[in-house]
């Protein structure tokens, strides 16, 4: 294991990571304000994500390199994407084509803005990332955590300046690549 790498630009958003060479695992914390939004309780222990994060890193690299305004695909109540996604999932229709088209739009958008599909089995908070103007909205919905896992931050969101978000994530991705891919 090497020392923990704090990657931050301000007190709003930071990442910290530690690498475990013997298992090719990375321990990752995503700090919003003073809270690690990846933190979860399992049994009597408070933990954070620790896994092989190669797929997640590739997803994050693609997201920050192609970041563009891409509004949530349907009209739904909520300030942040995670909350909109909760509310948008109530849609129903007797028209099967309309029903399928609606949920296909949601699923396509989620693949571009939600990192959970790239988790590869990690216990990972369900985060959404959306560029809106000069800010990246980071939001989360951890209502449906796996059995035995209780996230400390269930639903919420924050806005981070695009430049700060990019710089922090890019620095993490470079540190990860330097450690694992060289």
Each model region followed by its residue ranges:
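Preference for intrinsically disordered or flexible, low-complexity segments
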Residues: 1-182
């Amino acid at each position: 294991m090497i020392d923990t790498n704090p990657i931050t630009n301000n007190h709003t958003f930071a990442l910290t990571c530690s690498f475990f060479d013997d298992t090719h695992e990375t321990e990752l914390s995503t700090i919003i304000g003073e809270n690690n939004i990846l933190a979860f309780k399992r049994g009597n222990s408070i933990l954070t994500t620790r896994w092989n994060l190669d797929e997640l890193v590739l997803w994050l690299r693609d997201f920050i390199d192609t970041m563009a305004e891409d509004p949530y695909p349907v009209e739904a109540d909520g300030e942040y994407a995670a909350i909109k996604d909760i509310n948008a999932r109530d849609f129903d229709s007797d028209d099967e084509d309309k029903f399928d088209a609606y949920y296909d739009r949601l699923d396509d958008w989620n693949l571009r803005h939600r990192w959970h599909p790239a988790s590869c089995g990690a216990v990972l908070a369900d985060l959404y990332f959306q560029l809106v103007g000069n800010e990246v909205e980071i939001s989360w919905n951890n209502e449906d955590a796996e059995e035995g896992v209780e996230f400390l931050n269930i639903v919420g969101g924050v806005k981070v300046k695009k430049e700060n978000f990019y710089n922090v994530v890019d620095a993490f991705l470079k540190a990860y690549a330097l450690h694992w891919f060289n």
